[in-house]
Swiss-Prot record:
Disulfide bonds: none annotated. Required for the function of coenzyme Q in the respiratory chain. May serve as a chaperone or may be involved in the transport of Q6 from its site of synthesis to the catalytic sites of the respiratory complexes. One of its GO terms (biological process) is cellular respiration. GO terms for cellular component: mitochondrial inner membrane; mitochondrion. It comes from Mus musculus. Residues 1-39 form a transit peptide. The gene is Coq10b. This is Coenzyme Q-binding protein COQ10 homolog B, mitochondrial. Its main location: mitochondrion. The keyword Transferase does not apply. Pfam families: Polyketide_cyc.
């Protein structure tokens, strides 16, 4: 009797040391299938490897370019022009624009401005622009027709493929002698793709600030502008 009891005890111990063969019931199978489907939906099946980054990220994120600009990184010439009535005389505005040695004192982002040479109707200038420690220099030939025209064209080709700035002054409103009509235009194309993309982002704002800076300079030198009736004001802007 004791021997049979010992044999049954040993059999129970042995059966606990070996895996049992179990029959999977239909309910168990359904539960397992649900678990597998749930895991698959969550994308966390253990035996799956993570997909590469490009497959995980949305296409619109992967397609973004530098500064999130959707256009391709290609140089494009930018052009801007405007016509407006100013409350200063032709001579006053001509003197402000042609005084390039003073640009460093009032033109936004102009850190240094020098007249390299000068002769009748022309001068050669060198400007340093930018934000320290990133500064760029370029040289321009300036055509001067007093008091009608100041035209600056970049000549060194290191920073720009093309740069031309034109200020034209003509008589203003009849009956308002201290006014003039300004026709301003600028066109440029950077050599650097980075500069070109920055220009695309900030071009309009930079140009507006630049024109406003010349008006403030005229106000500082010659006092408040002539008061022009609102119905006679003219301001047209074109840019590409």
């Amino acid at each position: 009797m004791a021997a049979r009891t010992s044999q049954r005890a040993l059999a129970r111990v042995a059966s606990g040391c070996h895996p049992k063969s179990t029959t999977v019931t239909e309910a168990t199978a359904r539960g397992s299938a649900r678990d597998v489907r749930h895991l698959a939906a969550c994308g966390v099946l253990i035996n799956r490897t993570l997909p590469p980054c490009a497959a995980v990220l949305p296409k619109e994120i992967c397609a973004r370019t530098f500064f999130r600009i959707s256009a391709p990184l290609v140089n494009k010439r930018k052009e801007y022009s405007e016509r407006r009535i100013l409350g200063y005389s032709m001579q006053e505005m001509y003197d402000v624009v042609s005084g390039m040695e003073d640009y460093q004192h009032f033109v936004p982002w102009c850190k240094k401005s020098d007249i390299i040479s000068r002769r009748s109707g022309y001068c050669k200038t060198r400007l340093e622009v930018g934000f320290p420690p990133v500064l760029e220099r370029y040289t321009s030939i300036v055509t001067l027709v007093k008091p009608h025209l100041v035209k600056a064209s970049c000549t060194d080709g290191k920073l720009f493929n093309h740069l031309e700035t034109i200020w034209r002054f003509s008589p203003g409103l009849p009956g308002y002698p201290r006014t003039c009509t300004l026709d301003f235009s600028i066109s440029f194309e950077f050599r650097s793709l980075l500069h070109s993309q920055l220009a695309t982002l900030f071009f309009d704002e930079v140009v507006k600030q630049m024109v406003a800076a010349f008006e403030r300079r005229a106000c500082k030198l010659y006092g408040p502008e002539t008061n022009i009736p609102r119905e006679l004001m003219l301001h047209e802007i074109h840019h590409t």
